[in-house]
């Protein structure tokens, strides 16, 4: 006969089991809450984000420098040698040469986070040149490289993207090569027999009706890729806004230069070696052609959630070599932090030839909006974000000094 086994559980043991059961339930609930919280970041939910796409005029190229000088580069070094290091530890670039600076317009603050996916040198389509990958506004995916539209799609799935500012098209028109030709013509032809880049076939073919039509279609396709990326990520058109911006004038008209076109002072001192005639043509024909193509492409995309931001005159009064501003040494300054520096110095980086390149400067920074200009554009984007109800308009300087966020005063209207 087997002994009877007592299967009853005493009070202390019951309390232990109840405690274990309660802990199990609590952990299960926490896991569920954690899962819910993780899923809360995405289309229409969570912290709002601004994600910028495009080329050097939005990535933050030249953002390291605040003004220009022919003295020590330390006078204008606002961000230091880590200016373009955009990995998590700020020790290297995620894509070499993209130059995504910390002063870029993506980071508007005020409870809105920013992500900068733009890349200097980018065109509408991805490509590799001299072993450097340049992601376009497409879904390229090969060899570990991705297009910006694909990057956006992946990012937007797990973040609440509310505004997508875009700057694209300038490189499609080979504007950097155009500028190079203009500077070479200034340096290598005499004032009494000048070669004008604006009269060279290799330059003007970029602005021909046929090429304008081709590039306008490419820009439209890039914009539609952005909309497709957001749709693929689970967004409706009412949950985000695309903000297409055009390009600013970086130089004044010929009569607005503070250096004569006679001799070499204009380039050797000012870093703005263009003939008056070419400067006039750049502002009257070349840049308006690009800007019109960008905005017409935006219109043809027929997206109900698209706004435009006109920055063509955003830097007027602070442009490279423009009268009314100067190099730091010309304005009696020895630091970009000096009193009134933002009002007295240029917002466009000098054009540096190889022979004039020294210190930490890089050629790809030439003729780009610098630290002050990028903070100004950030102010413009903040106003375009409009506390979550995005709007478009034209952005221009509204006064001297800085706002509470340390940005130049600008008005979007």
Where are these predicted regions, by residue range?
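N-terminal export and membrane-targeting signals
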Residues: 2-23, 47, 362
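Conserved SGNH/GDSL esterase-like catalytic core that processes O-acyl groups on lipids
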Residues: 73-210
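A structural motif corresponding to the C-terminal end of an alpha-helix
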Residues: 105-114, 215-242, 278-310
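Mobile gating loops/cap/lid regions near enzyme active sites that modulate substrate access
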Residues: 249-368
């Amino acid at each position: 006969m087997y002994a009877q086994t007592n299967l009853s559980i005493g009070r202390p043991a019951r309390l232990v089991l109840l405690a274990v059961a309660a802990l199990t339930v609590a952990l299960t609930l926490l896991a569920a809450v954690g899962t819910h919280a993780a899923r809360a970041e995405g289309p229409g939910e969570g912290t709002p984000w601004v994600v910028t796409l495009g080329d050097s005029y939005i990535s933050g190229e030249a953002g390291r420098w605040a003004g220009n000088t022919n003295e020590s580069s330390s006078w204008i070094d606002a961000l230091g040698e880590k200016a373009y290091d955009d990995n998590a530890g700020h020790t290297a670039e995620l894509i070499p040469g993209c130059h995504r600076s910390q002063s870029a317009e993506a980071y508007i603050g005020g409870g809105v986070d920013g992500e900068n996916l733009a890349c200097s040198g980018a065109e509408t389509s991805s490509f590799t040149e001299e072993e450097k990958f340049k992601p376009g506004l497409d879904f390229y995916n090969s060899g570990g490289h991705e297009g910006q539209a694909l990057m956006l799609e992946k990012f937007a799935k797990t973040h609440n993207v509310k505004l997508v500012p875009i700057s694209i098209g300038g490189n499609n028109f080979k504007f950097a090569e155009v500028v190079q030709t203009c500077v070479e013509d200034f340096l290598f032809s005499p004032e009494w027999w000048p070669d004008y880049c604006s009269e060279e076939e290799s330059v003007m073919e970029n602005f021909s009706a046929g090429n304008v039509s081709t590039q306008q279609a490419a820009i439209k396709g890039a914009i539609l890729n952005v909309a497709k990326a957001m749709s693929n990520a689970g967004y409706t058109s009412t949950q985000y806004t695309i903000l297409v911006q055009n390009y600013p004038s970086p130089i004044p008209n010929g009569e607005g230069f503070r250096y004569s076109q006679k001799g070499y002072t204009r380039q050797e001192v000012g870093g703005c070696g263009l003939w008056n005639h070419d400067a006039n043509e750049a502002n009257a024909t070349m840049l308006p052609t690009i800007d019109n193509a960008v905005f017409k492409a935006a219109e043809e995309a027929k997206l109900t959630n698209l706004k435009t931001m006109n920055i063509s005159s955003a830097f007027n009064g602070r442009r490279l070599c423009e009268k009314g501003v100067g190099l730091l040494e010309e304005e009696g300054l020895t630091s970009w932090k000096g009193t009134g520096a933002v009002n007295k110095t240029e917002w466009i980086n000098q054009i540096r030839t190889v022979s004039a390149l020294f210190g930490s400067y890089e050629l790809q920074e030439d003729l780009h909006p610098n630290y002050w200009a990028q903070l100004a554009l950030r102010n413009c984007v903040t106003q375009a974000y409009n506390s979550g109800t995005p709007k478009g308009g034209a952005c221009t300087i509204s006064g001297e000094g800085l706002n509470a966020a340390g940005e130049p005063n600008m008005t979007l209207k």
